[in-house]
Amino acid sequence: DKGIAFIIGKTDGEMGLNLFSIFYSIGMHFINGPIYDERGKIIKYLPGSGTYTNCYMDITPCAVKIESAMEHAGITFVNSSFMSKVIVSPENYGPVKFVGCGFWGIQGLDYHGYLEGKGSVLFNACHFSGWDKNLKGYPCIYANNRDIFVNSCEFLNSEVNYPLIYLGPYVRNAIITFNISQSKFEVKNESFSGAEVIIKNNV
């Protein structure tokens, strides 16, 4: 419960398939990886990119932590399962995408997504179930990054009666459309005053 299952650094178009972990402190940890010169000396650290399909990070306080993703390529998860939350760090500049993924809660879970940084984060055709286990008022998705997209997702926690998504002051663009919730669909918008925010067609 103190280890990290997968540490991924400077990859360029990495393809991960059928990765699994359980009972680790972090399932997948994306970092700035070392770049070496011809003498084997580290000269700099750079983020990577890749697509990860059919991954299952089971029973963990943090399923995915992204410190940094390649700015022009990013990291994409497809048809994957995360039994807790994903964290995108303030240092991130690259796009992060979750497509057709499922999120489930564990005891004491707060958010399913805690997002910071200057990169974009997208959730498309995902479902969320079991955030804020102790009903303390945490949103499912805490977004305080530059760009956030939440589209065609399903929120299955019927016990909450407070906002599902929080938009913080560092948000510059947000598109939240065509989502379904078992409880009232509500977004708390505290984004930058000049932000472009579209919230519509949610039920």
Predicted feature locations:
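Extracellular/periplasmic carbohydrate-active domains that bind, remodel
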Residues: 1-203
